[in-house]
Amino acid sequence: MDITGLNELVEGILAIFNTQVIRIVLYGSYARGTNTSESDVDVALLLNGNLNESTEDKLSDMVVELNLKYDKVFSVIVIDYAVFKKWEMVTPFYKNVNEEGIVLWKAA
């Protein structure tokens, strides 16, 4: 799985959120290997706590820059880790992230 720009996305997320990041997970068609040229790159960002306006703006700006740079749509969904853990076996979306997702980065 070679997704141009994915490492840059992960590095950018870590630079913005630092110790708040619990896990970064690739999910969707790229994780399943069913992607096409029209597929977006779906990434779940599991954080300890919520976004503030400043970090949300930085994330949005970085993602837009990567979308333009690589002519690919990176779609980043931010999820509070406590909420994710509570509902991971119930909510279909969270189950999908757990079952099909590929962990790109995980806190030690």
Regions found by a protein language model. Name each.
Residues 1-22, 32-37, 48-108:
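Catalytic core of pol beta-like nucleotidyltransferases
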